[in-house]
From Swiss-Prot:
This is Oleosin-B4. It is found in: Lipid droplet; Membrane. The chain crosses the membrane at residues 16-36, 38-58, 69-89. It is a multi-pass membrane protein. It comes from Brassica napus. GO terms for cellular component: membrane; monolayer-surrounded lipid storage body. Pfam families: Oleosin. PANTHER family: OLEOSIN. Residues 162-185, 195-231, 247-263 have a biased composition (Basic and acidic residues).
Amino acid sequence: MRNEIQNETAQTDQTQGSMFSFFNLFPFLLPMFEVIKMVVASVASVVYLGFAGVTLSGSAVALAVSTPLFIIFSPILLPAIAATTVLAAGLGGKKVAAAPEASPAASPSLSLLGIPESIKPSNIIPESIKPSNIIPEGIKPSNIKDKIKDTIGKVKNKIKAKKEEKSKGKSEDSSKGKGKSKGEDTTTDDDTTTDEDKHGSGAKHGKGESKHGKGESTHGKGGKHGSEGKHGSGGSSMGGGKHGSGGKHETGGKHGSGGKHESGGSPMGGGKHGSEGKHGSGGASMGGGKHGSGGKHESGGSAMGGGKHGSGGKHGSEGKHGGEGSSMGKNSLSKKKKEFHYRGQAMDASSTSESSDGSSDGSSSDGSSHGSGGKHI
């Protein structure tokens, strides 16, 4: 037992000796180690105290600064905190139907502020000043719209009535014009072969370029044919030249002896015109018309067909009137003398008219046809 105890003590001594063997080798380091411990402890304590002091001082400064600020703003902060807690707690419940005035917490904002219920907006504004009572019923938007619609309808009815009156007036005027034309249209020249029957003197049959007849040629003997009468065809026509003496004969111009004759429509139909009959140019004047003191006058609408012209005979413009064809008239023999009428560029070779006085001025007898060879353009 003693041996074991001695061995153990020896081992402990060895371990302890090994621990301090460094100092045994360097024994002068032992006092320095003590100094080092003191220095390290002091430095550590200073650092620790420094951090602690900074922390404490920071907190102290924070307290010193925040406390007066809190005191200054407390009148605002405290009500704000109270309102926030009230709203967050949800104390503003609805009034109970059984006991509406039992708890003041039913309207928390008013109860907290102490505002009595008698000065609520619904109680302040009287019913007499409410918008529903201020605006009378007659000025409501629905009534205004109805009035506007009524006025617009009245204006439209007035405009329609005026238009109808104007249309009636125009129809009456047109009917009067037609009556006049019908009453004055019958150009009955009984003396179709009298001494002063001028036909085609200075007359232009075309668009002002080719003249139909000489300036002073008298056609037949008898009453004036086409003197101062007006024949106006309202429509468009290609042959717009003048034909006739005294009275102008146009497809869109004037022709007739006596009263006015105006056809309301376009001259699309062949009307008849003679010194002894009626002159109506109401239809499409597409076919050849006849014109003579004893015959009929049918004017071509665009003067596209051959019109015949002559007293007793026929004066037929075989080409287009308004086109390029030359008008060559065929006449009937009346007396003994034959002559050729040269007009413009074309020769009226077929018009073998017998002149009563033998002159070449176109003063032909009753039955002679006046066929001029000028081109009708």
